[in-house]
Amino acid sequence: VIIVDSVPDSAMLPLSTPPDSVCLLRLSAIGDTCHVVPLLRSLQRAWPQTRFSWVIGKAEARLMTLLPEIEFITVDKRAGLRGLRELRRTLGDRRFDLLLHLQLSIRASAVAAVIRARCKLGFDRARARELQWLFTDARIEPKTREHVLDSFMGFAAACGVEDRRLVWDLPLPEPARERARGLIPEDRGRAARTMVISACSSHALRNWRAERYAAVARHAIERHGMRVILAGGPARIEREMAEAIRRDCPSAIDQVGQDTLPELLALLQRATVLLAPDTGPAHMATMVGTPVIGLYAATNPARSGPYLSRQWCIDAFPRAAAAFLNSTPERLPWATKIERPGVMDLISVGEVCTRLDELLALPP
């Protein structure tokens, strides 16, 4: 069921025949683009002859261009009107059969306005924040309190696609695999047990303390004989975090700022587990089947946690809701963030170590 405005071509949904061309619009961030991939794979299975294009941010494209047979059209999100003019020149007089508008921001909607399509499908009115509904002429079925990935799969349902299995399947370049094998060598015929720590989120108030990461790293090394690798980007906050962790745990291997996104993905695929807050690498690990111990207090893992590892997440969001907002998650708007100083201190070293012990106790 979808709600359609009175625009003639929007009546094409759900589709009775495959479209010739589909454009997906999701500019950022890394984690959200990871959530788009199962939607794209579902559409590809249903419509093998359809041409797919993806309008995406430049940083995110460095990872997603691993997907074959997709045209990537990059947009410089910082370029403003100049970026929109460049996109208009790139697209020329092209007109897609269908645009999937997957981003709730006025900046993304400005991009959607530049893209010509017979039908522009967006979120239902209740979820279409920042006036997204003004830039679409069809809506997905209204749902409440969904994980972000599930909300994206609602676009496949609106198009009449029934096979919505979760498949990512990003081919990894052999040089990236080889680099990962160098960092995580073989041990008795399989990759050595390794915990990767991606310690920083895009928002500093979602980050755990360096000394707590170091304590868990020491536990992994001393109790389980694991290798510990610190991973992340080259930003100053990530470098400072890595240096602080290594002061308390010198055995941790510092890879922060040294990997491309495909190399990081290959490293995560070879790892035993990832420890991370609400950050893009948590969803990258999910794409390659690596379990994630997610640290969630500022955000709700039911909405934005690693999709296949929510049982391994430390969910301190209810504690945060009580401590900072005198409320419960059920009473708060679904997209609420509790990015307050000290919120991540609600997560203890002991509960993270216990979760790691439980995960490692499972048969390989």
How does the language model describe each region?
Residues 1-364:
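Catalytic machinery of carbohydrate-active enzymes
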